[in-house]
């Protein structure tokens, strides 16, 4: 059972995991683990399924998916019948008013919908993946020079489920630099997998860039792919100023993760998020929601 903290009700909720039985089988049984290593983590598996999700035939899955996971389609720009494929539905745009953004320059917002965990005063060589498992920032981005800038800083992990809105956005106004791509595997980023695969974020396909934000310093942004995520699509234009809340990109089908690293003494994360993170619980958040305040 995966429990997440609802910041509004201040209660814990059980996450309705898409493909839960399959995920538990592939990451918790000997046979499943073997299949994962031989097939599921490979690019060809995710590419093949991704191609299917681009077909018109895959659109037949949409109504059941919406019903099973209680997805609110009233906030989507398109009706269910208007999507050409499952991926078209998966990367759906939302009505702008459905995700209000706090324009106060001192407020740090969530870059997307998902479940958030935050660690402060991070040790660059022992960043927490999940309780008991760690990785290093050097391994994650393969750049020693940039890594040192985030010593004792903040690490924000936003885990997206297949049921979530899968576009990610800029948390402040500023100038985004070019994207660096790192090849890797396609393990699931579900907590079940995170408990089973050491240094999973460093094993998976990922992309990173520096965002020169106007209020929170240079933010290191990392997007991590996962099983069935055929593509991480960056839609922004490098070295051109963007406004807070502007779209940065999106993930095609599958669960996936966005990780932000902020320099020391740039932001104070909201107390409820920090407290839940220390207890091992993720907090459910929406794009545009306040998650921290600038340190003045």
UniProtKB/Swiss-Prot annotation:
Q: Which residues carry this modification: Pyruvic acid (Ser)?
A: 256
Give a short account of its post-translational modification: Is synthesized initially as an inactive proenzyme. Formation of the active enzyme involves a self-maturation process in which the active site pyruvoyl group is generated from an internal serine residue via an autocatalytic post-translational modification. Two non-identical subunits are generated from the proenzyme in this reaction, and the pyruvate is formed at the N-terminus of the alpha chain, which is derived from the carboxyl end of the proenzyme.
A Gene Ontology term for the protein's cellular component: plasma membrane
The catalytic activity of this protein is classed by the Enzyme Commission as 4.1.1.65
Which pathway, per its entry?
A: Phospholipid metabolism; phosphatidylethanolamine biosynthesis; phosphatidylethanolamine from CDP-diacylglycerol: step 2/2
Is Cell membrane tagged as a keyword? Answer: yes
According to its UniProt record, which residues of this chain constitute the active site?
Answer: 113 (charge relay system), 169 (charge relay system), 256 (charge relay system), 256 (schiff-base intermediate with substrate)
**Record text on cofactor binding:** Binds 1 pyruvoyl group covalently per subunit.
Compartment annotation: Cell membrane
Keywords linked to the UniProt accession: Cell membrane, Decarboxylase, Lipid biosynthesis, Lipid metabolism, Lyase, Membrane, Phospholipid biosynthesis, Phospholipid metabolism, Pyruvate, Zymogen
Q: Which reaction does it catalyse?
A: a 1,2-diacyl-sn-glycero-3-phospho-L-serine + H(+) = a 1,2-diacyl-sn-glycero-3-phosphoethanolamine + CO2
Q: Where is this site: Cleavage (non-hydrolytic)?
A: 255-256
> Which InterPro entries does this entry report, sorted A to Z?
PS_Dcarbxylase (IPR003817), PSD-B (IPR033177), PSD_type2_pro (IPR033179)
The main enzyme category here is lyase
Q: Which cofactor(s) are needed, names only?
A: pyruvate
What quaternary arrangement does the UniProt entry report? Heterodimer of a large membrane-associated beta subunit and a small pyruvoyl-containing alpha subunit.
Q: Which family does it belong to?
A: Belongs to the phosphatidylserine decarboxylase family. PSD-B subfamily. Prokaryotic type II sub-subfamily.
Q: What is this protein called?
A: Phosphatidylserine decarboxylase proenzyme
Organism (species): Clostridium botulinum (strain Alaska E43 / Type E3)
Tell me the gene name: psd
């Amino acid at each position: 059972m995966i429990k997440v903290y609802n910041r509004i009700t201040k209660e814990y909720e059980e996450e309705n995991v898409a493909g839960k039985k399959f995920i538990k089988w592939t990451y918790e049984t000997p046979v499943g683990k073997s299949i994962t290593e031989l097939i599921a983590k490979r690019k060809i598996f995710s590419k093949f399924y991704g191609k299917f999700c681009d077909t018109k035939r895959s659109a037949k899955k949409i109504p059941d998916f919406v019903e099973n996971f209680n997805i609110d389609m009233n906030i989507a720009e398109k009706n269910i019948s208007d999507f050409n494929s499952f991926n078209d539905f998966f990367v759906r745009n939302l009505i702008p008013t459905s995700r209000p953004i706090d324009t106060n320059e001192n407020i740090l917002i969530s870059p997307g919908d998902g479940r958030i965990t935050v660690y402060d005063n991070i040790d660059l060589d022992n960043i927490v993946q999940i309780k008991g498992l760690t990785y290093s920032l050097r391994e994650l981005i393969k750049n020693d020079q940039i890594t040192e800038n985030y010593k004792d800083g903040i690490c924000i992990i936003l885990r997206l489920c297949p049921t979530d809105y899968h576009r990610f956005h800029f948390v402040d106004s500023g100038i985004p630099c070019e994207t660096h791509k790192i090849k890797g595997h396609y393990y699931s980023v579900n907590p079940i997998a995170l408990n089973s695969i050491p240094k999973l974020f460093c094993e998976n396909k990922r992309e990173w860039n520096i965002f020169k934000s106007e209020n929170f310093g240079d933010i290191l942004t990392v997007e991590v792919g996962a099983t069935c995520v055929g593509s991480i699509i960056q839609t922004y234009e490098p070295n051109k100023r963007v406004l807070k809340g502007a779209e940065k990109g999106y993930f095609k089908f599958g669960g996936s993760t966005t990780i932000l690293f902020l320099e020391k003494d740039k932001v104070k994360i909201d107390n409820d998020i920090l407290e839940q993170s220390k207890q091992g619980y993720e907090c459910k958040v929406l794009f545009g929601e306040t998650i921290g305040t600038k340190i003045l």
